[in-house]
Regions:
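Catalytic beta/alpha-barrel core
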Residues: 73-76, 122-134, 148-157, 182-185
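Alpha-helix-loop-beta-strand connector modules within alpha/beta enzyme cores
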Residues: 61-97, 140-150, 154, 190-207, ...
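Glycine-rich phosphate-binding active-site loops on the catalytic face of alpha/beta enzymes
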Residues: 47-55, 124-126, 131, 175-183, ...
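Alpha/beta catalytic cores of nucleotide-metabolism and tRNA/nucleoside-modifying enzymes
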Residues: 81, 197-205, 214-224, 228-282
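N-terminal amphipathic alpha-helix/helix-capping segment at the start of soluble metabolic enzymes
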Residues: 1-20, 85-89, 267
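Hydrophobic faces of well-ordered beta-strands that scaffold small-molecule active sites
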Residues: 19-23, 48-50, 96-100, 125-127, ...
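Glycine/Thr-rich beta-alpha phosphate-binding loop at enzyme active sites
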Residues: 64, 74, 152, 162-201, ...
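Catalytic cores of alpha/beta
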Residues: 30-38, 157-166, 209, 213-229
Length: 282
């Protein structure tokens, strides 16, 4: 069983939903990304999603687009990101998932990427613009290196494609709460719950719901019908607001912690004391 599946199995035994924060690697810089990984693990993240910056992030809203632009202006590369994950993983045990467009990974080399990602401690990779009909070789490569291939499904995903994704995915299925790009929203539609039911009809994999989740109330709502909630733009927006602050790490950590505390589920991260002592030295 992969570490991603072990995490979901542990959540099921504990009777609680998963909390998956997203950050863009290299925003505002790669050293801060390393410290944020440690901090988010300390406050209670179950899995951390790390975005690979790309120059044409068509699936992302303005907040994450700006984060990608800032990271690219700093010259952040795939190699930098993997090295960052490797350093952070010396101090944390939370599974890490890369969220990327295919172009940066192709440029790096898919076999090399899978090998280096595994060595760095990455547990799963989601390629947002790779359709399942063209993903056989990619999926086989990831599985060869014990990495979980993660796929997106949306309310507009056809039943046929949903079945293909169910056959190829490992770890969990990433369900998009609504059609469109990433970004925080005030309200969620019924489409999300309907989509999760459709996934369950063809797969026994856990389902994480993302895109548009930004409040504790929304997280609680998602946990009623999905195994985990992904919080992206809301956290990236906090990083953007605090980019010039020397207290960025603590304040982003407090923001993430506040979301969890307001769900009335308090929990320490894995090795939280150790992670905090490490972060204070970085």
């Amino acid at each position: 069983m992969s570490r991603i599946r072990e995490t979901f199995a542990s959540l099921k035994r504990a009777g609680r939903g998963g909390f998956i924060p997203f950050i863009t690697a290299g925003d505002p810089d790669i050293a801060t990304t390393e410290r944020l990984l440690i901090e988010l693990a300390a406050v209670g993240a179950d899995i951390i999603e790390v975005g690979v910056p790309f120059s044409d992030p068509v699936a992302d809203g303005e907040t994450i687009q700006r984060a990608s632009e800032r990271a690219l202006l700093k010259g952040v590369t795939v190699a930098d990101i993997l090295a960052c994950v490797a350093r952070a993983k010396q101090h944390i045990d939370v599974p890490i998932m890369l969220f990327s467009y295919f172009n940066p990974l192709l440029s790096f080399g898919t076999d090399r990427l899978a090998n280096d990602a595994k060595e760095a401690g990455v547990d799963a990779i989601l390629v947002t613009d790779l359709i399942p009909e063209e993903a056989d070789t990619w999926t086989e490569t990831l599985i060869q290196f014990d990495l979980d291939p993660i796929f997106l499904v949306a309310p507009t995903t056809s039943d046929e494609r949903l079945k293909q994704i169910a056959q190829q995915a490992r770890g969990f299925v990433y369900a998009v709460s609504r059609a469109g790009v990433t970004g925080a929203r005030d309200e969620m539609t019924e489409d999300a719950e309907v989509l999760v039911k459709r996934v369950r009809s063809v797969s026994d994999l856990p389902v994480a719901l993302g895109f548009g989740i930004s409040t504790a109330e929304q997280i609680q709502h998602v946990w009623k019908f999905a195994e985990a909630a992904v919080i992206g733009s809301a956290i990236v927006r906090e990083i953007e607001k605090l980019a010039a602050s020397p207290d960025l790490i603590n304040r982003v950590g407090e923001f993430a912690r506040s979301l969890l505390e307001r769900t009335q589920i308090r929990r320490a991260g894995r090795g939280a004391k150790r992670q905090r002592s490490v972060n204070s030295k970085l």
